[in-house]
C-alpha cells in the first residue's frame, strides 16, 4: 500500500490502476478495498492460484471482487503467468458483472486478418462498455491495428511518451507511423524477450536514478554486469537514457 500511496501522491491527474491479484480471495478483497480507499482509479485482477482453477472458481473470484468494491476492474487474461485460459463465454459472463470495465488480453497474431478476427470474436461476447486492451509490448501495435481500445504497456510505465507515440498514431488511423515507431523499439523488445519486461524496466529505472539497483522483490533478481550494460546501451541508442 505504501507504493500505491506514493504513486497516487505523485500522479496528479493521471489515473492509477492497482494490481490486486493474490492466491486467496480474502486477500484479493482486502487489497481491493485498500486500493479503493486509497483512491485508485482502477483495479487489475488476474486469477492467480497454486492449484489450477476451474471456470466457476474464476467467475466466483470476480463476482466476489465486484461485490466488495465499486472501483472499475480490469480482467487480466495472462495464461502464461496464471496457467488459466479464459474461454470467450467466460469472458462474457464476467463482463456482465458490475464494475468490470476492461479486459487485458494476451498478445495477438501478427497476421492482421487473424488478429482482427480474434478481437471481433471476443467482442461478440462483451457488453459495449467493456474495453479491450492489448498486452505484450512487442506486438501491441498488432492489437491496436486489430481494433483494441488501448494498450496496457510495460514501457509506458517508465517511458509514457514513447508509448503514446504509438497509441496516438494508431488512434488517428496512421498505422504506418504506429508500426514504424514500434519497429524502432525492436532492440528494447528484444531485451524484454531475453530478460523479461519487469527486469528490464527495473534496470532502466535504476539507470535513470529512480530506484536502487536491487529494487525487485525477491525471488526476482535485478540485472547486473553485462546484462545491465546491454540495457544501458540499448536505452542510449534509443535516446531514452
Segments and roles (model prediction):
Residues 1-85:
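Active-site beta->alpha loop and helix N-cap motifs at the rims of alpha/beta catalytic domains
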Residues 144-148, 184-218:
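Conserved short secondary-structure transition element at the edge of the structured enzyme core
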Residues 67, 79-193:
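Catalytic alpha/beta core domains of metabolic enzymes, predominantly
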Residues 1, 28, 119, 140, ...:
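A general structural signal for well-ordered alpha-helical segments in protein cores
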Residues 4, 35, 65, 103, ...:
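Conserved, mostly hydrophobic/aromatic
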